[in-house]
């Protein structure tokens, strides 16, 4: 089973991706991980990627697609795979299609943006230990203070409201069009991946069961 999981940052894709991969015994494939591994292994594509990264450039779609095609030929992908954070653009989706990479399911986790902002901007962290809290859903015993050490909690830069809104804006402009792309393809062609949307609001188990229902 070959799966693409879509959804905005903070929608809970990571948790659901782990659930899917465990249930179906398939690997979670991240382009970031692929790049790091290719660079470390000095593969031809890794060498090309490193040249671009060393000067602060953006990795081309050709390199990304090449890495993806290499990765899905490995033994652990024989039962399928789950793409995490890929494709990000229509160009990448078209390249997958052109190169004959079969996708069975595209699952979109939908969460209202204001809910995501509340989720992410409410996070607080104790950096030394890695403990995390939430001002609403999992508050510390004393506001702003770690339960164990009594030290101050901080809000990570990535969780600041302005940062979250900026990331959501990028997602809306760049990745959200993929939803329309896969919906349109499915409506026109029976061989297209099956697209389904899942409401990402609720308990982790509720969202998990909705995702499984789409895949079944």
From Swiss-Prot:
Annotated compartments: Cytoplasm
Annotated AMP binding sites: 31, 36, 57-59, 85-88, 92, 156, 167
GO biological process, one term: AMP salvage
Pfam families: ADK, ADK_lid
UniProt GO cellular component terms: cytoplasm
Location of region: LID: 122-159
Region ranges (NMP): 30-59
The protein's enzyme class: transferase
Highest taxon in the source lineage: Bacteria
Sorted UniProt keywords: ATP-binding, Cytoplasm, Kinase, Nucleotide biosynthesis, Nucleotide-binding, Transferase
NCBIfam families: adk (TIGR01351), PRK00279.1-1 (NF001379), PRK00279.1-2 (NF001380), PRK00279.1-3 (NF001381), PRK14527.1 (NF011100)
Subunit structure: Monomer.
Reported function: Catalyzes the reversible transfer of the terminal phosphate group between ATP and AMP. Plays an important role in cellular energy homeostasis and in adenine nucleotide metabolism.
Family under the similarity heading: Belongs to the adenylate kinase family.
Domain remark text: Consists of three domains, a large central CORE domain and two small peripheral domains, NMPbind and LID, which undergo movements during catalysis. The LID domain closes over the site of phosphoryl transfer upon ATP binding. Assembling and dissambling the active center during each catalytic cycle provides an effective means to prevent ATP hydrolysis.
Protein name: Adenylate kinase
